[in-house]
């Protein structure tokens, strides 16, 4: 990632970077792109630790520090008081676990246990046996799409009935394909759901389906779609204000003033370059993702 960032930074014809995907890759790139005064706009690097590394960092990603509390608050609204947290034992999973646990306990709930697993695990019988013995009334799932789907499937097979809620990566057709009927009732955080999209969002859903053989876009697809338009919008405004010229610096200044109506909401950035916003709660109903209704 660092080598790629340096290559882009050294090429004066490249004015901005869209990405990277993983927090670890973005962290390696930011000092380089920052020194080069090159705007870097991400949609999926979510760790709080990235904030403040570079004045040229902009983030549309759903952030760990906000998602954990959202999951906790959702369970509290549902009257849940006893949680178990299952988390992938990496920076992402640990950060999400910590933010969930802190908020759930602040709400008056009890975290019975926080149980780690490895991203490469496929058999979760051991940790799910622990979960079942603790008898929680809710489960916070802090991992990624594939491991999350396997945990959901195996938990239901073992008779664990507590509601499960996780991060935006669980809004994926892959989860339903892997977990099957066990995905019914799953809750997850998100910024977009095809079934609840407005007119602009529905137009995107239709075009996406036409392009990709009927596939339904998930939240990451919607964010990436908006990402490109946010960059284009900023470039257009910067050129208008600077006699048709566009540089990395003027593009960055335009990004700071962004107020773009996208399919995922109105995109704006705070002083740290973060998009501070509310998140949706999604659920699987009749095999499809929809907005959760209280």
What are the roles of these predicted feature ranges?
Residues 1-294:
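Extracytosolic ligand-binding ectodomains
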């Amino acid at each position: 990632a660092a080598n790629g960032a340096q290559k882009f930074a050294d090429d004066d014809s490249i004015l901005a970077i869209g990405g990277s995907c993983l927090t670890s890759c973005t962290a390696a790139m930011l000092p380089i792109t920052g020194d080069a005064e090159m705007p870097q706009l991400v949609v999926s690097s979510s760790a709080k630790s990235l904030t403040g590394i570079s004045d040229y960092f902009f983030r549309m990603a759903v952030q760990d520090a906000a998602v954990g509390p959202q999951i906790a608050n959702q369970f509290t609204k549902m009257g849940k008081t006893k949680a178990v947290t299952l988390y992938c034992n990496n920076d992402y999973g640990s950060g999400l676990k910590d933010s969930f646990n802190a908020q759930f306990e602040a709400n008056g709930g009890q975290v019975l246990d926080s149980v780690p697993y490895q991203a490469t695990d496929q058999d979760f019988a051991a940790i799910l046996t622990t979960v079942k013995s603790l008898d929680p009334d809710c489960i916070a799932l802090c991992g990624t799409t594939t491991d999350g789907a396997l945990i959901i499937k195996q938990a239901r097979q073992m008779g664990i009935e507590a509601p499960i809620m996780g991060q935006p990566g669980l809004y994926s057709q892959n989860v339903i394909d892997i977990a099957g009927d066990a995905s019914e009732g799953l809750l997850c955080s998100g910024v977009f759901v095809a079934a609840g999209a407005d007119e602009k969002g529905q137009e995107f859903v239709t075009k996406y389906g036409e392009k990709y053989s009927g596939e339904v876009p998930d939240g990451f697809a919607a964010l990436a779609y908006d990402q490109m338009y946010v960059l284009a919008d900023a470039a257009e405004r910067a050129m208008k204000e600077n006699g048709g010229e566009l540089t990395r610096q003027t593009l960055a200044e335009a990004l700071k003033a962004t107020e773009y109506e996208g399919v995922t909401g109105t995109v704006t950035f705070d002083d740290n370059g973060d998009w501070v916003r509310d998140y949706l709660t999604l659920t699987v109903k009749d095999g499809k993702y929809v907005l959760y209704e209280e």
